[in-house]
Design a protein with these regions (language model features):
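Face-selective signature of the C-terminal outer-membrane beta-barrel domain
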Residues: 5-22, 45-179
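Acidic/polar loop-and-plug regions of large Gram-negative outer-membrane beta-barrel proteins
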Residues: 16-45
Length: 179
């Protein structure tokens, strides 16, 4: 969805979102004589996944200046599971159980000013991301072994930026600089 509202000449708000739900299952009714299909059936896990992204952009117009505030959040949840020979009757047959989440939150502010033939933009951003993973995997080699790991990671980042652009009156020359 996308909703854009102009409250007045100076104030504008846009809100948008996108989401998906995936529930993938194995087609166990395939031809048992088809080796390539049986290989895939025995190799691929069942996957459940859901994702969404939500965001909002507020703009304030003031003559040659525009202030913009952007706030967004993205989320992905993923779950994979696999049983040996697709036999779910016992946990002894479990070969893979993976659950993970990825979450990102973003905030950005910028001010854009048009001064003659120059375009000046400055601002800052603050982001926080989380990654979680809990995995169990049973590997069958010469000696069967179990692999287990768990991750819970949070990352904070921030930044500032400034850019300046110039475009000649006849549009034959342009230049920009920023950091």
């Amino acid at each position: 969805f996308k909703v854009k509202t102009r409250f007045s000449q100076e104030h504008e708000l846009t809100v948008l979102g996108l989401g998906a739900i995936d529930d993938m299952k194995l087609n166990t009714e395939t031809d048992p004589e088809d080796e390539s299909k049986q290989y895939l059936l025995n190799y691929l896990p069942t996957i459940k996944q859901n994702t969404y992204t939500l965001g909002a952009v507020y703009k304030h117009y003031s003559g040659n200046h525009t202030q913009t505030v952007v706030l967004s959040r993205s989320f992905m949840n993923n779950s994979n599971i696999k049983y040996r020979d697709n036999d779910e009757s016992s946990t002894d047959n479990l070969t893979l159980r993976l659950k993970s989440d990825e979450i990102e939150n973003h905030l950005r502010f910028e001010n854009r000013s048009l001064v003659g033939l120059f375009d000046l933009t400055a601002g800052f951003n603050v982001d926080y991301a989380v990654y979680r993973n809990n995995t169990f995997q049973r590997a069958f080699t010469d000696i069967p072994k179990e692999i287990r790991y768990k991750t819970d990671l949070g990352l904070f980042k921030w930044g500032i930026f400034v850019t300046s652009g110039y475009k000649s009156a006849d549009d034959r020359f342009s230049a920009s600089f920023g950091f």
